[in-house]
Amino acid sequence: WYSSMFAANIKQEPISHHHHHHHAHHSHHQHPHDSNSNSNASSPHQSPLPSPNPPSNTNLQLEQYLKQQQQQQQQQQQQQQQQPMDTLCAAAMTPSPSNNDQNSPLMLPGLPNPMQSIMLANLRPSPTTTTTTTTPAAAPTTTAATIALQANDKLQALTPPMDVTPPKSPAKSQQSCAEPEKEHDLMSNSSEDMKYMA
């Protein structure tokens, strides 16, 4: 095919050498340009990255990709989250009097000192009644919630839409905590009195 085109060009050549040379140059120039415009036209559809204006396109692609990933991760995490988070919250909260009392010395001075203050700030407004009255329960609750929040923060770092669940998980933790806290209230009456005296 290419040689036949050349043959046609060569046949035209004797007509006017100069015109043919110009035409050959033009067609030669046009052909790569054609393929370029084709590849440019097709490449943004196939892969926006090699497009002439990378910033806007890559940003668009990145945003779309991130959105897709976040949606996928959010769906996965909502499926994972709603089952394990419930069980994790319930598991973390129900043994909260015993289990997290052991954890709290490790947790409080250790990792989440800034996290702890944030958690306390987050916890104070909503379960004020429970946290203020039950000091011993407050510590396990916060540590358990801190662990949950740390997990959520790691997820949040990956997926901003995870903001959906942290409001949920404190609410869940309050509901699931309410029972251990009530049991703990009966156990911790003396320390409540001590707190009130202090």
UniProtKB/Swiss-Prot annotation:
<dbReference type="GO" id="GO:0005634">
    <property type="term" value="C:nucleus"/>
</dbReference>
<dbReference type="GO" id="GO:0008270">
    <property type="term" value="F:zinc ion binding"/>
</dbReference>
<feature type="compositionally biased region" description="Basic and acidic residues">
    <location>
        <begin position="179"/>
        <end position="198"/>
    </location>
</feature>
<feature type="region of interest" description="Disordered">
    <location>
        <begin position="152"/>
        <end position="198"/>
    </location>
</feature>
<keyword id="KW-0479">Metal-binding</keyword>
<keyword id="KW-0238">DNA-binding</keyword>
<keyword id="KW-0217">Developmental protein</keyword>
<comment type="function">
    <text>Gap class segmentation protein that controls development of head structures.</text>
</comment>
<feature type="region of interest" description="Disordered">
    <location>
        <begin position="16"/>
        <end position="111"/>
    </location>
</feature>
<dbReference type="GO" id="GO:0003677">
    <property type="term" value="F:DNA binding"/>
</dbReference>
<protein>
    <recommendedName>
        <fullName>Protein hunchback</fullName>
    </recommendedName>
</protein>
<feature type="compositionally biased region" description="Low complexity">
    <location>
        <begin position="56"/>
        <end position="83"/>
    </location>
</feature>
<keyword id="KW-0302">Gap protein</keyword>
<feature type="compositionally biased region" description="Basic residues">
    <location>
        <begin position="17"/>
        <end position="31"/>
    </location>
</feature>
<feature type="compositionally biased region" description="Low complexity">
    <location>
        <begin position="35"/>
        <end position="46"/>
    </location>
</feature>
<dbReference type="GO" id="GO:0035282">
    <property type="term" value="P:segmentation"/>
</dbReference>
<keyword id="KW-0539">Nucleus</keyword>
<keyword id="KW-0677">Repeat</keyword>
<keyword id="KW-0863">Zinc-finger</keyword>
<feature type="compositionally biased region" description="Polar residues">
    <location>
        <begin position="95"/>
        <end position="105"/>
    </location>
</feature>
<comment type="similarity">
    <text>Belongs to the hunchback C2H2-type zinc-finger protein family.</text>
</comment>
<keyword id="KW-0862">Zinc</keyword>
